[in-house]
């Protein structure tokens, strides 16, 4: 049997990252070492609580570490401190506009808490004591990882690979030239790109080709499990919001 691939997820959990956590945890070929939260689509308290809610739905025991609440450098543009509200759209028959990323996922409040150690120190401690066999998978701003690299540059030699979602070649989602995860903390992105670590970038051009539709959402819901329902709820929310943004 092939050895499981050890990964640490770094997330700014909304509906998309919730599915990423569930997918990673349930993949038989992955050993989910931990999940670290960071400010991004929503401020840190929301992304952290959402991560804990997903863990509860999974009935999992992987540790969750709270990370950085702001970008590495002072605010240069509005909303770069996790105050980004995302796109909103008004849906006929509904009083309030729908946000792509709501503050809280529609899951029960978490009954558990994060680890006491900060995510940055967790990265340093874990990687420095590892055998170089851990892959980092950030799907939000790169603040936590970049900060750890600045504090202890030696961790770069211990990272097996960084597989990140960020950037775009022909697609953007924040400005005419920027994808959100890079835009939210470009200094952190520069540090990670210059780290010398093996890096694979999954840009918007790729993620926008990995579509999921209403039929697949219904199939998840038909599983009749808490996780199936949670995935379907996340997908249905995005379908509803995006269908009114087109």
Question: What are these language model-derived features?
Answer:
Residues 1-246:
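N-terminal acidic, glycine/proline-rich low-complexity segments
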